[in-house]
Amino acid sequence: MADVKRVYTFGNKEAEGNGKMRELLGGKGANLAEMNLIGIPVPPGFTITTEVCAEFYKHGKEAVIEMLRPEVEKAMKNIEKLTGMKFGDKEMPLLVSVRSGARASMPGMMDTILNLGMNDQAVEAVAKRTGNPRFAWDSYRRFVQMYGDVVLGMKPVSKEDHDPFEVIIEEQKAKKGVKNDTDLTTDDLKELVKNFKAAVKKQTGEDFPTCPWDQLWGAICAVFGSWMNERAILYRKLNNIPAEWGTAVSVQAMVFGNMGENSATGVAFSRDAATGENLFNGEYLINAQGEDVVAGIRTPQQITIEGSKRWAVAQKVSEEERKAKFPSLEEVMPEVYKELDEIQHHLEQYFKDMQDIEFTIQDGKLWMLQCRNGKRTGAAMVKIAMDMLREGLIDEKTAVLRCEPAKLDELLHPVFDKKAIANAQVIPRGLPAPPGAATGPVVFFAEDAEKVLEKTGQRAILVRIETSPEDLKGMLDAAGILTARGGMTSHAAVVARGMGKCCVSGAGELQIDYKARTIQVNGFTVKEGDWISLNGSTGEVYLGQVATKAADLSGDFGQLMDLAGKYSVLKVRANADTPKDAAQAFAFGAEGIGLCRTEHMFFEGDRIKAIREMILADDEAGRRVALAKLLPIQRGDFEGLFKAMNGYPVTVRLLDPPLHEFVPHDEKGQKEMAAEMGVPLQKIVAKVESLAEFNPMLGHRGCRLGNTYPEITEMQARAIIEAAMNVKATGIPVHVEIMVPLVGNHKELRYQKNIIDTTAEQVFSERNDKIDYMVGTMIEVPRAAVTANQIAEVAEFFSFGTNDLTQMTLGFSRDDIGKFLPVYLEKGILKNDPFQILDRNGVGQLIREAVFKGRGTRENLKCGICGEHGGEPSSVEFCHYAGLNYVSCSPFRVPIARLAAAHAALNQK
């Protein structure tokens, strides 16, 4: 605990920190400091650094409080000086907010406390000073509610129960016959505070703390503690945020949006976070505090006239009713709106990115509480980057780096078919949050979404009155989210947008009964397990399952892909087994096929019969008869691939799986095979038993099969070469690469290459023509990697099969790792699932060694990977640094890999 600065003050257009100090002050603290420095109106406060978070977990609560006390007391005096109020004073009490602020934005994952410093004396002083006792008691009840939840652990007893404080509020409203919190009187609020405190005493056995300093230390430590809560841990895991970063804590003088009809609070975006449209938008609530907007307990109104009119059209509200009941901030407080509009524009121009801002209007005065780069959908991400490039706000390289590769996946998600929508039954309408389409069975609790996915593989629709941060895991596992309350800036909408999940919020017609597990809406009853569909673009909710179609990609997407190609070094190919897959990959910009799995061609129609005939053959002659039937089929398949790729390289892998995968293992299937093949059942059973292996992954497969039965390699080589020559004859150039799988010894490869070359020469002689082709190998056996110098004497290219290379290097079975992987991740034994993200220290080192040794033998050796890692951004980055020529992935991952390759090249420079 060396003598270092742990607290940084800000206020009155001065700050000890700045926007570049995110690592130390967190995103919120750094931006609060920066907004002060550029003249934005921000309530004064101070930020406790992220380093203290680490000390909190190392030394404990009491040690951290004693360590912080002098600096915090000094910083509090600075706030007192700037506000003219005093913390803990009985006449002019200073009230503060306590908020988390990690280096990376984690919306709703950690805790916030408002109105801290309130007690029985302070509430009377605030009432007297403002002449507004209702406001004072409303602020007091909010503080007790938030502090009770965050610091004292006042949570629902079971998942069917509601928040204990909300239950008390609902009882009070029912007792008074009112609908909204804002309809409660001062006396009602006094009774709420009394009942809140009684509930705290009953559940915790302790009195609610009244000393402001005790409250402050409790809140600071609770915010640090929230860094390791379950939802924050999960969010960090999903977004690759290291636990060691920690969170900062910002303490700020309160400004109040709940002082009456001339006060408000809101959240806004400088551009549309769902679509990317250059339209200032957001939501606000009159006579409310910030948590009311994001918590979704009240459905807010729109900030701009344009946004309000669009909302009214979507909700089928007339213009007359909109103006009377749901006016925009632009109409209600035009001068404040004008200032807010100028500030948002200033912030976007200054930070050169779309801004998410929180603000409060206290008695007609605008205050900014936060700004950050806004979370956005994949579609919005691309549009904003391309628009800002066209506007001259950012350059090409920044535009490319501004787009996260993984989020491109959202653009490729299916959308509802318009014809299907026309015939669908709309039940309610809500507010469209992230666009897209989602369909699935209804569940009402987060853990049930997890269970449905685990049991059925089907993603459900999570239906909630409003979501809370505790629902994060269920939201992740759901296909979409539907809420009865909340707006487009509520927790559900913001988190869903960040995840790329479809969400419809604020569907107020829904009557949700958690205990009965039903929804009542417009005469319909929807039970748990019934299917519904969500339209995230319109806010409509449909009964049943609605058909979907492939998404239409925008011109901005094409422009981004062009830029990615301009700045990347690493090429991107696709794993494709059919002409349809190849055409899709080509449309996404793939520069070849990096893996064509020939065995996938054997499972259709008469093909499986021919391969089974080969398996049942008693000798080579019999096998050749069966293979002759497969030859024209394979040749036709290859012709389709070569035509689809139109001159780009195509890597064809020879037969890889063991033969037992082509025969049935159940009695019914074996009987059907016997009848179809016209042989006794006993022969089928005997053959299946003879093919069985204890460890088929390491068994009779790949080049071992080709060397045992060279006639298989001959047939495939002939089909490939003949197909290439046929396509070449049509005027389409062909670049074919023949890949031998599972090589661990250069002699295995040499035997296979000799068969391929001999077969090719026979075809050339028959056709009186030639084509160029290459023979290479998959590096998936660790021995192949460490003897790559020998293998490169034969191989003209290497393709790393990282799926099997990971299995053999780590000794993990991909099919069985699920039994212990969660424990290994939790204990930190593994940082990531090695089958999702390449293990750089183990598998990665083998790849580097193989590339180095291989090119030592053959200088121009082409190297790529074709495992699932080829479409994972951080693995693509590794491949760039390792000097590979290309990565290959599934067609729908091609855009992601292309953008990741550009990121790797730009970040290296």
Q: Where are the regions that the model predicts?
A:
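Short mixed-charge
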Residues: K77-D89, I519-N522, A729, E761-K770
